[in-house]
């Protein structure tokens, strides 16, 4: 399977292989994924904007459906029956009706026979686009521990529930959600950029620009409220961006509760929190 999507940690190589394998009723071990080669990869608008699974995944689903149809048609031709009389189980095409009932031909034989003529290639190219991307939804709740003297704060627990349609791969969806939540917490509580009056960047290394590690945050719990998106591949929709949006307001609300008054989301650093407290 040759795809244009780039796996930047989104897990799309695995997820797109799963979609193809589901349609073709085979193991993901039987799907070889070739992606992100600008010499030979097909065009893809990019792995961003919450669109990889929803848009590219749908292209893969449609492509696999067409390939399956061609396999069934070619298998029926070899058996000598109508395409409407055959089924495909991932390994062979079998006739289920008529005078050839019970006859079958293996996928290996179909592949070999398809190379002996040029009337039907078992190779499919498909594109898919969508003017919209159905929004995912998420709710997040933060428990924040605050030092009332210094203003230092730490997220003790963060609970999230995500509606990303039907997760194609729940494990990958969960770790992507955890990573996005951690990034959102860092943007809210520790990451900052300031300049001198001469335009010099103060946070010019990771000693000053403090990205939180997994050790800096308490427990992150992610659950899924599965729905079914009719326009998505097997009911899936996006998850990549929504998970970074909730930590900032959740942490801000927690600190506001601790301070007993509203705290601006732009003032979550320790000295600012201490002043608010």
Which residues does each predicted region cover?
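C-terminal catalytic domains of large/alpha subunits in multi-subunit enzymes
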Residues: 19-269
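Conserved short loop/turn motifs at secondary-structure junctions
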Residues: 5-6, 61
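Thiamine diphosphate
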Residues: 12-19
